[in-house]
Amino acid sequence: MKKILIVEGNLREENQSFTDGGIKTHTESLKDSINYFTKDLEIDVVNPSSDSNVSDVVKNLNKYDGMIWGGSSLNIYNDTPEIRRQLDFMRECQNNIKNILAICWGMQVAVTVAGGEVKRCERGAHRGIAHDIEINEEGLKHNIYKNKNKIFNTPAFNFDEVVTLPANSILLASNSINKVMGVSFKAGVSNIWGIQYHPEISYEKMISLIHFRTERLLNNKAFK
């Protein structure tokens, strides 16, 4: 049975607020999505910002066939201890795990560790849905977009974007908000597929997230 590691990007306090609000955490959504396709996987979960056993997990990273790193409300350019722990953990993962799917925040962490850069979005933000993502010619040849419509919409929630890709990256998809909506690159021993959207989150959950974050969004002038 193949072994998969899911990395939770949100802080424990944020996840508790999700639970208190009746909303599934990103890890729970990822598990639901995986279970929809197969239950024939052994799945472990780690939160590098909050868990006390991260060093033990690092020692055994090479036992995993793949890793999925999910979303977060954090901003990579804020130099906090929690973010530094995530960057350190991603660095270990890139040295030990061959296949990584990096979703939204996960992509931003993977890109940063591999030498790229993330900044605040300059052309707006995705607040629930990313419209008109277009797969380019390289993307149409990539397995992540096999049988995918060339132009599609999908759940997304991000205010930051990748502005500089790691060396030897292949841009796969873009839209009018973010040039980097899909990317493939290698770092360490890892083949990394990165996406700036959330295929694991239902539209229903995204609506709940918007209601849940209404005050925060308004205070941050997210709809200005």
List where the protein language model places each region:
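Short loop/helix-cap segments at secondary-structure boundaries that form the rim of catalytic
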Residues: 58-61, 109-112, 163-166, 184-185
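Conserved beta-strand termini and adjacent loop/short-helix elements that scaffold enzyme active sites
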Residues: 46-49, 121, 157, 174
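Cysteine-nucleophile active-site neighborhood
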Residues: 72-139
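Amide-donor transfer/coupling interface in amidating biosynthetic enzymes
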Residues: 2-19, 24-36, 89, 135-224
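N-terminal beta1-alpha1 cap of cysteine-dependent amidohydrolase-like domains
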Residues: 1-88, 92-96, 223-224
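A short acidic, often aromatic-flanked loop/helix-cap motif at beta-alpha or helix-coil junctions
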Residues: 50-55, 126-128, 140, 179-181
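Short, flexible loop segments at the rims of nucleotide/cofactor-binding pockets, characterized by
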Residues: 43-48, 77-80, 130-134, 149-151, ...
